[in-house]
Regions:
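Acyl-donor (CoA/ACP) binding surface of acyl/acetyltransferases
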Residues: 4-9, 13, 46-155
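Conserved GNAT-fold acetyl-CoA-binding loop/helix
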Residues: 10-32, 43-45
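Short beta-turn/strand-loop junction motif enriched in small, turn-promoting residues
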Residues: 34-35, 135
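Short loop/turn motifs at secondary-structure junctions and domain boundaries
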Residues: 35-41
Length: 155
């Protein structure tokens, strides 16, 4: 994680965490992911290259009642090839096999056009503008406007 994307300032530009400065930052994140998985509160997966063991990124969902909130990060080297769109589609399909999940949502900074396009290609619909919604510390200490996206399970 550290070498693949954790320390990359461009990858971390729109996320809500600062780039990692040492391996122990990754150990803390992995520990938190494992605790959340055990508690059933969130599920995170690391994404690896098809033909090898190179880490490409990560994707996760956080459970909130009848819905899941989606988040993802991808190593810059793999931007623009559709890998994350594929991962999002797989995770959403998995989520909708859970009887209690009716909605998968995502929030994206209004300037993050790559994520906007990704979510729309994956079938998410923009629901609206969330004013001063999230602090992206690599951009500003002031909360920034974000778009809310969702995909609803067909009932």
């Amino acid at each position: 994680m550290f070498a693949a994307y954790g320390q990359d300032h461009e990858v971390a530009h729109y996320v809500t965490w600062r780039p990692h400065t040492c391996i122990s930052d990754n150990e803390v994140v992995i520990g938190r992911f494992l605790d959340l998985w055990r508690d059933g509160c969130a599920f995170h997966w690391l994404l690896f290259q098809y033909s090898g063991s190179e880490l490409m990124g990560a994707i996760g969902v956080r459970r909130e009642a009848h819905r899941l909130e989606l988040g993802y990060v991808l190593t810059r080297r793999y931007w623009g090839y559709g890998f994350m769109t594929e991962a999002v589609t797989v995770v959403v399909d998995w989520a909708f096999t859970e009887p209690s999940v009716f909605r998968v949502g995502a929030v994206v900074d209004i300037d993050n056009q790559r994520s906007v396009r990704l979510l729309e290609r994956a079938g998410f619909e923009r629901e609206g503008l969330l004013r001063s919604w999230a602090v992206h510390p690599n951009i500003s200490a002031t909360p920034r406007d974000c778009y809310s996206y969702s995909k609803i399970r067909n009932i």
